[in-house]
From Swiss-Prot:
A molecular function GO annotation: endonuclease activity
One matching Pfam family: HTH_WhiA
Listed GO biological process terms: cell division; regulation of sporulation
The protein's name in its UniProt record: Probable cell division protein WhiA
Keyword Metal-binding listed: no
Gene: whiA
Coiled coil found in the keyword field: no
Species of origin: Clostridium botulinum (strain Eklund 17B / Type B)
Annotated keywords: Cell cycle, Cell division, DNA-binding
Reported function: Involved in cell division and chromosome segregation.
Amino acid sequence: MSFSSKVKGEICRYVDMCKEDALAEISAIMKVSGTIAFSGSGLSFKMTTENPASARLIFTLLKEHFNIHSKLMVKKSNSLKKNNIYMVVISEDMGVRELLYETGILQDIDGIMNLNYRINKSMIETEENRRAYIRGAFIGGGSISNPERTYHLEFVTHSEEYAIDLKDIINTFGLNSKVIQRKSSHIIYIKEGEQIVDLLNIIGAHASLLELENIRIMKEMRNNVNRLVNCETANLSKTVNAAVRQVESIRLIQNKIGLQRLPQNLREVAELRLNYPDESLKELGQMLDPQVGKSGINHRLRKIEKIAEELRTGN
């Protein structure tokens, strides 16, 4: 089961709500996943989903809060996956016309019936109304990627005006959702893991939220370990390269003028480095009597490398 299906399965359990919240939720579902049809038998409305939990919720909300006994149909998808497609159909005799006006999908302008692509403010007056509306929009047209791979949550809509309205509702909770166009669709999306967690909390997907948080923590731990390993590997490589360079410089001095020509403090360090090429600067310093700190050893080796460079260039 995909992570999106888990989230929808969880939030579709919310059926015990007041009429105002039910109206906000069913309106959002209908706006993003429904189609209107006109035929000889009148007006009809169809909502389509691949998620059985979503279909059950739509059927239940219509029955319990609007006294509409809709028709639930199932057919096989034409896609390679051959998933079931669930359709909830409301016909003229079931009260579809009244429902379309009540949910704000239809409106009269100068006595003429028109489609309304905006979200009615009266439907989202309270915080709970807005939570229900966002939940409905996710049930009808939302998806979330597998958080093991990437963080991405989106709502697919078919109207720019509607997408902007929905984005504004989401952002009243302090989020930073954005709208982009993808072919003929308008997408509201969130890409930051922390903000996706907040949105799951808003719509009541608490179990999914905890699962995502656990994944985020594990990913962060793995990333921190990888960064630490990379840092240690880089430091080790740097140390090894420095030791090789120091040994090469000391051998050059040895071959050109002999180490006995070096001042005693430099000669001692040069001989130690030749005899212990794998030891750290700190360990080399501890071998001297009296002991010398890491910075002191580093300073002497830099002087040795400078002498070698002068011999190499003939200065």
